[in-house]
């Protein structure tokens, strides 16, 4: 019996060693080919614009020609827009492989709010996705066309109270940050506006610039790049933003719209991706986000950075899940 135990012990030890060596090999070799990142919004929008910047240094090499971040492999952005992100995220969860070569950009509160409001319609939630790292936090801003009669939030609110349901506001989709900001504004100001969802921030911006809607909520970074063609009335955050220092927060105007709609952006993998692969990504991706060239390019584009580690994002996701579940009980309108 003792000889059998000895054989089993040696076999187990050999198996454990083999597993350890395999894990080490994965960490040493991954990635061996380009990585794709799905962006669930259209080309030219804030998420697409920023995703291309924060991943542009993926294949960077040092002066000696050694890979700095992801083994010298590039990241390729794949746009799959539609339904405020639902099309891209649903396809990612249903079709991608959990191997670390197919990743996706996340938007919070968007995907979390949608998983709460549409649990049967969407396939994604915080349980079947794995955060890697966060690169930015983009507040929602209330915008109107340069030719609009509204020069302030007070003008906007006064008109809305005198004309219930007449103001149309565009946004990037249902239960994305823009929609949440719109619902908060209606409740806090005691007004009724009509929210017009679109396929993403680019289309929502076009609605405002083209006069199809009277105003809209959009990303601060998108508004910043179009600031010569817009009036930016207020920012839905707790503090003014350094890129638009003259734009007040709703809070300072006496309207209780907080930072619930701030758009956190980052990269995620599928649940089930091997731990060694997750570890490589969790180590290298935040460093890539913090690259000096990335930071400079993001600042040039008026894109607020907020780099967070995997552990920090895991905590943020759980907190937002709990918070949004409560918030949407009060804000949700019947669809």
What is the predicted function of each stretch?
Residues 28-127, 166, 174, 187-217, ...:
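N-terminal (or domain-start) structured segment
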Residues 297-316:
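Surface-exposed aromatic
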């Amino acid at each position: 019996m003792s000889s059998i135990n000895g054989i089993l012990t040696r076999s187990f030890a050999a198996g454990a060693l083999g597993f350890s060596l395999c894990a080490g090999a994965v960490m040493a070799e991954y990635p061996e080919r380009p990585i794709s990142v799905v962006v669930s919004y259209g080309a030219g929008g804030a998420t697409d614009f920023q995703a291309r910047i924060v991943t542009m240094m993926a294949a960077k090499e040092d002066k000696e020609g050694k890979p700095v971040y992801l083994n010298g492999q590039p990241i390729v952005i794949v746009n799959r827009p539609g339904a405020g992100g639902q099309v891209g995220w649903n396809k990612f969860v249903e079709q991608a492989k959990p191997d670390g070569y197919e990743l996706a950009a996340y938007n919070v509160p968007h995907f979390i709010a949608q998983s709460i409001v549409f649990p049967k319609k969407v396939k994604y939630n915080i349980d079947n996705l794995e955060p890697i790292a966060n690169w930015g936090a983009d507040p929602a801003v209330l915008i109107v066309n340069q030719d609009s009669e509204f020069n302030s939030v007070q003008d906007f609110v006064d008109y809305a109270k005198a004309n219930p349901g007449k103001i149309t506001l565009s946004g990037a989709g249902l239960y994305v940050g823009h929609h949440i900001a719109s619902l908060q504004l209606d409740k806090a100001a005691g007004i009724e506006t009509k929210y017009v969802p679109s396929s993403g921030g680019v289309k929502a911006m076009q609605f405002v610039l083209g006069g199809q809607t009277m105003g809209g909520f959009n990303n601060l970074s998108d508004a910043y790049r179009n600031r010569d063609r817009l009036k930016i009335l207020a920012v839905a955050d707790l503090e003014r933003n350094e890129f638009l220092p003259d734009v007040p927060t709703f809070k300072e105007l006496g309207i209780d719209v907080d930072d619930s709609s701030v758009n956190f952006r980052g990269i995620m993998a599928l649940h089930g991706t091997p731990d060694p692969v997750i570890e490589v990504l969790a180590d290298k991706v935040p460093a890539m986000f913090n690259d000096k060239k990335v930071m400079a390019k993001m600042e040039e584009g008026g894109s607020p950075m907020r780099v967070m580690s995997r552990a920090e994002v895991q905590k943020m996701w759980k907190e937002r899940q709990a918070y949004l579940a409560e918030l949407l009980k009060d804000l949700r309108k019947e669809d």
